């Protein structure tokens, strides 16, 4: 059913839930999981310098922790950290899903950057509209 699952992660509780949902889908279907973490960057107006709120090590550590959750359950997992420009995360997630030929995209309903009161985070909302693949949004 789901041979290839892409799960988008950040440092949020919803992200942890998404990893667990991807794990459960993979265990049920015998699929493998790709864990994608995007580091959003902004261009500085004066200097053109990139500003990123987390270190490469922090991002890599989170991906490694997510991959560990999956492999402990017997799921084959791959992890990747990519940089993207602020506001382009949804496109990157969809493009990565195409690249790995994912059968489904799994992600949290809100990430750490979304306003807590929103029912559906802006990135999840955009992914749903941009993707031609099923999207499982975890709450």
Task: List the predicted regions and their residue ranges.
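Short, hinge-like loop/turn segments at secondary-structure boundaries
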Residues: 51-54, 96-98, 123-124
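Glycine-rich, Arg-bearing micro-motifs that act as flexible, cationic patches
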Residues: 104-126
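Structural beta-alpha unit
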Residues: 71-105
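Acidic, proline/glycine-rich short linear motifs
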Residues: 37-62, 92
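Short, flexible loop segments at boundaries between secondary-structure elements
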Residues: 135-138
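Small/aliphatic-rich secondary-structure junction motif
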Residues: 3-49, 75
